């Protein structure tokens, strides 16, 4: 596996791959890699001739300076994990390499970027669009792979791709979970022992909420999930919304969509965890 720290060296690698008519799959990450990331690498390796990963903690998508400072960084371990997973190249740049000048672009990402995470983390999705668009222009991938734990982010990136007219297919990959149900996240390492013990309750309560669907409205299910989690120690729901999986607009009736998704953000102690559940039949 080759490791690149500069845009020029990455573009040179991509140019050679393109000259050989090879397809390229891109897996953008912020590092602190876990089995969820590796599942994306395996999918890209299976579907494309060349798999390129990026490891970059993007400062423009953090609206909380402390969250940026606390985000785990393990570049040496990440490189080893990627090599073992069969990745062909990894881009591990400095902030200055990605942003030689401040990125002042403001994207019109539509309503999918204004709700849920967009409402609670102002500027977050514009920062995501800034860095992902840069990566897409550097690598020019045929496909790019993202995990469905970040369900709203995938919708936002698809909106950006349509806005810019980029020739890349966005591939959404299933959530990977611990045996106890907790969605894998780089932030999980920050959980204390008591918090880690209670965190799987998020997925458990979401799973139980499926059984309420036949006899309860989305509003009633939303209320039950929120109250059930808030009643547990260390957990505080920031939001839980049941939305149409395409528009991400809240639904009042199950009949409003055949693709209902419940999206949640919960503080477990001081660690912000996200998850989601599909309510499809």
Curated annotation (Swiss-Prot):
What SUPFAM superfamilies does the database record attribute to this sequence? Answer: Nucleotidylyl transferase
Q: Which domain of life is it from?
A: Bacteria
Q: What is its main location?
A: cytoplasm
Its annotated compartments are: Cytoplasm
Biochemical pathway: Cofactor biosynthesis; (R)-pantothenate biosynthesis; (R)-pantothenate from (R)-pantoate and beta-alanine: step 1/1
Q: Which GO terms describe its cellular component?
A: cytosol
Name the Gene Ontology molecular function terms of this record.
ATP binding; pantoate-beta-alanine ligase activity
Which Enzyme Commission number(s) are listed? 6.3.2.1
Q: Where is the active site?
A: 37 (proton donor)
An example Gene Ontology biological process: pantothenate biosynthetic process
Q: Which UniProt keywords apply?
A: ATP-binding, Cytoplasm, Ligase, Nucleotide-binding, Pantothenate biosynthesis
What does the record give as the reaction this protein catalyses? (R)-pantoate + beta-alanine + ATP = (R)-pantothenate + AMP + diphosphate + H(+)
Q: Where does (R)-pantoate bind?
A: 61, 153
> Which leading EC class covers this enzyme?
ligase
Binding residue positions for ATP: 30-37, 147-150, 176, 184-187
Task: Kindly list the positions annotated as binding beta-alanine.
Answer: 61
Entry function: Catalyzes the condensation of pantoate with beta-alanine in an ATP-dependent reaction via a pantoyl-adenylate intermediate.
Record's miscellaneous remark:
The reaction proceeds by a bi uni uni bi ping pong mechanism.
Under the subunit heading, UniProt states:
Homodimer.
Provide the family line.
Belongs to the pantothenate synthetase family.
What is this protein's record name?
Pantothenate synthetase
Q: What is the lineage of its organism?
A: Bacteria, Pseudomonadati, Bacteroidota, Bacteroidia, Bacteroidales
């Amino acid at each position: 596996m080759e490791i690149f720290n500069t845009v020029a060296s990455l573009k040179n690698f991509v140019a050679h791959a393109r000259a050989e008519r090879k397809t390229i799959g891109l897996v953008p990450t912020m590092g602190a890699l876990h089995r969820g990331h590796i599942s994306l690498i395996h999918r890209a390796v299976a579907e494309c001739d060349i798999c390129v990963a990026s490891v970059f903690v993007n400062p423009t998508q953090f609206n909380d300076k402390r969250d940026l400072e606390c985000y785990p960084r393990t570049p040496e371990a990440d490189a080893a994990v990627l090599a073992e997973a069969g990745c062909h190249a990894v881009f591990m740049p400095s902030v200055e390499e990605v942003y030689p000048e401040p990125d002042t672009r403001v994207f019109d990402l539509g309503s999918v970027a204004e709700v849920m995470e967009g409402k609670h983390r102002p500027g977050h999705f514009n920062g995501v669009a800034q860095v992902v668009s840069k990566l897409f222009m550097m690598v020019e991938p045929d496909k790019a792979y993202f995990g469905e734990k970040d369900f709203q982010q995938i919708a936002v990136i698809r909106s950006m791709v349509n806005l810019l007219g980029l020739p890349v297919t966005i591939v959404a990959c299933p959530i990977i979970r611990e045996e106890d149900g907790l969605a894998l996240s780089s932030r999980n390492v920050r959980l204390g022992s008591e918090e880690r013990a209670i965190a799987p309750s998020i997925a458990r309560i979401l799973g139980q909420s499926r059984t309420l669907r036949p006899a309860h409205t989305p509003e009633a299910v939303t209320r039950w999930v929120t109250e059930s989690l808030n009643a547990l120690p260390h957990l505080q729901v920031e939001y839980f919304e049941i939305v149409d999986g395409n528009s991400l607009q809240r639904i009042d009736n199950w009949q409003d969509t055949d693709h209902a998704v419940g999206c949640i953000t919960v503080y477990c102690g001081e660690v912000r965890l996200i998850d989601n559940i599909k309510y499809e039949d």
